[in-house]
Amino acid sequence: MSSGVQPTQECLEKFQELKTGKKLTYVIYGLSEDKRSIVVLKASEDKDFDSFVAELPEKDCRWAVYDFEFTLPGGEGVRNKLCFIVWSPDDASVKNKMIFASSKEAIRRRLDGIHTEIQATDFSEITKDALFEKATRK
């Protein structure tokens, strides 16, 4: 069931900037204060994965796209995959979790070029190893 919430034009523009410009490393999305639209909360060039994870709140939901760069074993080179992350921490309110769950597809379907998706409820589920496993799965 859809909540009727839609992403702003800035959401789509920042995603395109991440996807094509390769300057941004991640974009974090959330709901506007009136909960009527999806907005960009942060877009960053910081390549430090731990800094990205630190931007996710302990008690509030978010969506994010992270440009995950990794090295394949056996000398196969460096790859990049766009990962869509659904952050719905256990400590978020039930109402917030419901709004985010019902609004996810509104943003996800507008972000063409996502390779993989991770849904996480705890920081232990958002690790480089988890992203690597998803990004290299065939």
Curated annotation (Swiss-Prot):
Keyword Cell division included in the entry's annotation: yes
Location within or outside the cell: Cytoplasm; Cytoplasm, Cytoskeleton; Nucleus matrix
GO molecular function: actin filament binding
CDD domains: ADF_cofilin_like (cd11286)
InterPro entries from the UniProt entry: ADF-H (IPR002108), ADF-H/Gelsolin-like_dom_sf (IPR029006), ADF/Cofilin (IPR017904)
Keyword presence, Cytoplasm: yes
Function: Controls reversibly actin polymerization and depolymerization in a pH-sensitive manner. It has the ability to bind G- and F-actin in a 1:1 ratio of cofilin to actin. Binding to F-actin is regulated by tropomyosin. It is the major component of intranuclear and cytoplasmic actin rods. Required for accumulation of actin at the cell division site via depolymerizing actin at the cell ends. In association with myosin II has a role in the assembly of the contractile ring via severing actin filaments. Involved in the maintenance of the contractile ring once formed.
Name by which UniProt lists this protein: Cofilin
Source organism: Cryptococcus neoformans var. neoformans serotype D (strain JEC21 / ATCC MYA-565) (Filobasidiella neoformans)
